[in-house]
Design a protein with these regions (language model features):
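Short hydrophobic/glycine-rich mini-motifs in sensory/regulatory modules
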Residues: 119-129
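A short beta-strand signature within small-molecule sensing/ligand-binding domains used
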Residues: 108-117
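Helix-start (N-cap) segments at beta->loop->alpha junctions
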Residues: 131-143
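Short N-terminal helix-loop-first-beta-strand/juxtamembrane motif that initiates sensory/input modules
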Residues: 41-65
């Protein structure tokens, strides 16, 4: 996790956009967003697998819901669907928001996601890093 910046994850979304109706309403700090994205892309390149990365945040306006803050080169496929970026928090992701890594395999056995807590410099959990890999050798789409 040393390559993914917790401060950038915490602060890249501007305060006015932290409660939003849809991802189209987000306003990002471009420099922090780019720093976070570089970290996600670095994790993807370091892996020997075709891994997809993303950072999830808790929705302050919707308890029990998380949304995808930023993805690497492709959306993590297990939980993100077209136009569905805010999702009910799966058990493994909830575990990561509590400070412990979690693992979840999709019901159809196609995807494996590993969730890791993403702390800032004060060790506050500011998000969750997801690493998602296909268990059937399917290639992720490139954004």
């Amino acid at each position: 996790l040393a390559v993914v910046d917790g401060e950038a994850a915490r602060d890249c979304l501007r305060p006015t956009s932290r409660v939003a109706i849809s991802p189209d309403d987000y306003e990002y700090d471009v420099d922090l967003c780019n720093a976070l994205r570089r970290g996600l892309l670095r994790v993807e390149r370091l892996s020997d697998l075709e891994v997809q990365t993303g950072v999830w945040r808790l929705r302050p306006d919707q308890p029990g819901v998380a949304d995808l803050l930023l993805a690497g080169k492709g959306y993590p496929r297990q939980f993100v669907r077209w136009n569905e970026y805010a999702i009910p928090i799966p058990a493994a992701m909830h575990q990561a928001f509590q400070g412990e890594p979690g693992v979840e395999v999709s019901q159809d056995g196609r995807w494996l996601s590993v969730f890791a807590p993403l702390p800032d410099s004060l060790d506050d959990i500011v998000g969750v890093l997801e690493l998602c890999v296909s268990l059937r050798g399917e290639l992720p789409p490139v954004l």
